[in-house]
Amino acid sequence: MQEPHNQEPIEEQKLSEMEDTLEKQHSGASTENTERAEEGVVIPDLEQQLKEAEIRAAEHHDAWLRAKAETENIRKRAQTDIANAHKYAIDNFATQLLAVMDSLDAALAVENSTIESLKDGVELTRKQLAAVFEKFNIHTINPQGEKFDPHQHEAMCTVESDIPPNTVTQVMQKGYVLHERVIRPAMVAVSKAKST
């Protein structure tokens, strides 16, 4: 009778093992199904992220292309503006000189003019020209009696004199300054000490 009694625990043990196996299989299948379900969710989520990233990349690329084109357009406009500034830089100055030319033409058109009227006309024309020069900051360099300045004067000759050496004794041709830049130096004679 002991054998049947021993068989019962063996059978119970087998049943218990079978239940454990079934539970493991069931939980394994459940885990596998959960993993598959998660993969199914993860894959569409990654695909969505990829699509969004591709859209953003395309938008950034388009924005970059537009910015590049705009930069190129700005560069071309700047080059055109600079070229026009160089080309037409003296436009206003030239317009002001037209009045001087008109005065000279009017003086030449007078048939029976006297020397006095010609002189008066030339004097008025010179005043017009001086006004244009003043307006555009063109100033005369007339250094008579001043110390020689090689930045503004060009010595044409030296003359022995009693006045201090390196003094301008004669202005042969006036010079001109535009703002602070010498556009033509004054042509001058400069004193030197008398030789003994």
From Swiss-Prot:
UniProt keyword Protein biosynthesis present: no
Gene3D superfamilies found in the cross-reference section: 3.90.20.20, Head domain of nucleotide exchange factor GrpE (2.30.22.10)
GO biological process: protein folding
Basic and acidic residues composition bias: residue spans: 1-26
Region Disordered: start-end pairs: 1-40
GO cellular component: cytosol
SUPFAM superfamilies linked to this entry: Coiled-coil domain of nucleotide exchange factor GrpE, Head domain of nucleotide exchange factor GrpE
Intracellular or extracellular location(s): Cytoplasm
Function per UniProt: Participates actively in the response to hyperosmotic and heat shock by preventing the aggregation of stress-denatured proteins, in association with DnaK and GrpE. It is the nucleotide exchange factor for DnaK and may function as a thermosensor. Unfolded proteins bind initially to DnaJ; upon interaction with the DnaJ-bound protein, DnaK hydrolyzes its bound ATP, resulting in the formation of a stable complex. GrpE releases ADP from DnaK; ATP binding to DnaK triggers the release of the substrate protein, thus completing the reaction cycle.
Record's protein name: Protein GrpE
